[in-house]
Amino acid sequence: MSKFGFYSEKASITFESHLVGIEEKTRELLLNLRAFIISLGDNVIEEPRPHRIAYAKSLNFRVFADVQPKDDSLKISVRKNRTEALVTCVVSNLSELEKAKSQISEAYHKIK
């Protein structure tokens, strides 16, 4: 069973499987973003799913960031709490990534 309890282990989806078939610059953005999100705290949970990678702070608040790798960009969705609308952006360069990191950090620190 996965960390969130949605998928069985036999699905065997890994973070690395999301690196296959995307452009090098997108791969670098994704690796940079992953390192940043994991560095936010010891309680960050990474859950690779078939078409995206979900990040949660705990099992109580399911997901604060979703990253969907595309060929030439990353589609990032951020949820700051259960009542606010999901904020989605498309990132294709470092300056856009820095803006997304700011929103992700805010979401991580805002949720309890």
Ranges and model annotations:
Residues M1-K112:
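Charge-dense, helix-prone N-terminal extensions
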